[in-house]
Amino acid sequence: MEKLISVAVMRASDAAEIAGGTDSKTLMYRAGLGLFQSWNWHGRIDIVTGSGNNAGDGYVLALLLHQHGIPCRIVRTTEKNSPDGGYFFLKCEERGISVTDSIDFSHTDIIVDCLLGTGFRGELRPAMRQIVEQINQSGASVLSVDINSGMNGDSGEGFCVRSDRTVSIGCLKYGHLLGMAQGKIDSLYNYDIGIPCKGSYLPLFSGDTGAPENWDF
């Protein structure tokens, strides 16, 4: 049984887990592993990143793809990183994973949307809206990390990336399933990274955390 919670509850649960002794980079690794396991990876893969922890999840995914001999490209929209995201980005650079700041999806088969997380509120800035429009018009398959970039995690409102699949991290958020998210998420998958969350229950298929914890790439 899945839990359906607010963004604030997820954030507090995440903070409590870290305060209790779980390494935040371990949680980020688990999230990236959930992404890796949730898709049939093939063709040209672009991992489009912003500045937050969603980007860090994408960097872990890039490392796992590289580890399994699957080429990918990181498309950075900013040079800023969260502390944990920066750690995994340096690992990507050390391994020679392709990195670009050019937004061109004309030959892309799969786009991984790691731009904005569940904390986003309000309207997209013009530059970010343009990137979202380019993703939506690309014709590529799209996987969104935790929430579709631009979507309000509590209400489902907002101009946002349209995904073929969204992989929620930890627990489902209200915004994933409210009516305003209709037409924006084609399929929804939740990956449990081992954070206890308080909330109402909803039946939905979920991944698990049964994989090894070794993220020393």
Outline where the language-model segments fall.
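YjeF_N-associated NAD(P)HX repair module
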Residues: 2-5, 17, 110-217
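An N-terminal, well-structured beta->alpha segment
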Residues: 1-48, 216-217
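Electropositive phosphate-/nucleotide-binding environments in soluble metabolic enzymes
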Residues: 4-7, 21, 25-33, 55, ...
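Nucleotide and nucleotide-moiety/phosphate-recognizing core
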Residues: 36-115, 123-145
